[in-house]
């Protein structure tokens, strides 16, 4: 990786912290009560924010980092890790989040971007970062900046999983192509370097992904996951875990749905368990059909 030895060592620690969330569900919460519900349901971590993506989308305006006092209240309410969101490129929001002691920082396209040229240089922070991606190029660029965890961008706040599926399938297909290049030639470097240029991704990270057959860091699903079936679908597509935003606390029975999604991620290969946990959950969030959305209303296109 393009970093000093110290930064590389720090990155190994941060990537290890992200690995600890593997196989888990991370839930958006807006207050201490929701955070406790998430913890009781078996969430691996919570994402503290003032408005879930569905409300950010509905209310409009500039979406910024949440009030630190609200984040601290959630941190005091639970024993599981707490994440919080900062705007793309807003390294001072990240400094504040690190100063109050959040466990992970999400440089998130759900908030209004603060910089149209640069993402945060995440190697400068001790806290591990999670970032979204739509494809392998975006994922590897974020990892090169220091992201210890990747998630699909999906289309947050819609309850429509189609974009998350597309982003995961795109990453999988692009890794498969890199792996095919690596395995089909006695000297794959020239072709792999050409593919890295095409993806606008660092060659060393592309080669690592090709060798491993997966991203070098954990890769979670996010954006539109609303049901246990959605969560299991993303796990079967190769995700390491799931973020659920508006899908839990915008549904009919939040406690029951939260537990069901945790169970679905744990037993994602068992249709009988999935059928059982999908019963009697009340109404799922009504949501928005992504195919009816205008391009300018899509959050996933934020970032580059």
From Swiss-Prot:
GO terms for molecular function: amine-lyase activity; pyridoxal 5'-phosphate synthase (glutamine hydrolysing) activity. D-ribose 5-phosphate binds at residues 28, 157, 224, 245-246. The keyword Lyase applies. Pathway: Cofactor biosynthesis; pyridoxal 5'-phosphate biosynthesis. GO terms for biological process: amino acid metabolic process; pyridoxal phosphate biosynthetic process; pyridoxine biosynthetic process. GO terms for cellular component: extracellular region. Its EC number is 4.3.3.6. It is an enzyme of class 4 (lyase). The active site is at 85 (schiff-base intermediate with d-ribose 5-phosphate). Transmembrane segments: none annotated. Disruption phenotype: Defects cause some indirect sensitivity to photosensitizers, due to the inability to synthesize pyridoxal 5'-phosphate. Indeed, pyridoxal 5'-phosphate is destroyed in the presence of photosensitizers, and cannot be synthesized in reaction. PROSITE patterns: PDXS_SNZ_1, PDXS_SNZ_2. SUPFAM superfamilies: Ribulose-phoshate binding barrel. Keywords: Lyase, Pyridoxal phosphate, Schiff base. Pfam families: SOR_SNZ. InterPro entries: Aldolase_TIM, PdxS/SNZ, PdxS/SNZ_N, RibuloseP-bd_barrel. Belongs to the PdxS/SNZ family. This is Pyridoxal 5'-phosphate synthase subunit pyroA.
């Amino acid at each position: 990786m393009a970093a000093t030895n110290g930064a590389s060592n720090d990155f190994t620690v941060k990537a290890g912290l992200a690995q600890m969330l593997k196989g888990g569900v991370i839930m958006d919460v807006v207050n201490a009560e929701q955070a406790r519900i998430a913890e009781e349901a078996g969430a691996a971590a919570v994402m503290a924010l003032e408005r879930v993506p569905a409300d950010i989308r509905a209310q409009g305006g500039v979406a910024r980092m949440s009030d630190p006092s609200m984040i601290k209240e959630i941190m005091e309410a639970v024993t599981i890790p707490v994440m919080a969101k900062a705007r793309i490129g807003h390294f001072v929001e990240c400094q504040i989040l690190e100063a109050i002691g959040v466990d992970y920082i999400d440089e998130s396209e759900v908030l209004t971007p603060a910089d149209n040229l640069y993402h945060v240089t995440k190697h400068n922070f001790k806290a591990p970062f999670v970032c979204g991606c739509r494809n392998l190029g975006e994922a590897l660029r974020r990892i090169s900046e220091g992201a210890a965890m990747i998630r699909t961008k999906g289309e947050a706040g819609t309850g429509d999983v189609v974009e998350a599926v597309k982003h995961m399938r795109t990453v999988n297909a692009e890794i498969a192509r890199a792996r095919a290049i690596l395995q089909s030639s006695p000297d794959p470097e020239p072709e792999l370097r050409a593919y890295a240029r095409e993806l606008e991704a660092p060659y060393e990270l592309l080669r690592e992904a090709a060798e491993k057959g997966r991203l070098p860091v954990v890769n979670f699903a996010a954006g539109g996951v609303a049901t246990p079936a959605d969560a299991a679908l993303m796990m079967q597509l190769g995700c390491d875990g799931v973020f659920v935003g508006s899908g839990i606390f915008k549904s009919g029975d939040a406690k029951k749905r939260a537990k069901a999604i945790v169970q679905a991620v744990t037993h994602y290969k068992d249709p009988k368990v999935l059928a059982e946990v999908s019963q009697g959950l009340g109404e799922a969030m009504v949501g928005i059909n992504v195919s009816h959305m205008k391009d300018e209303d899509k959050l996933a296109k934020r970032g580059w």
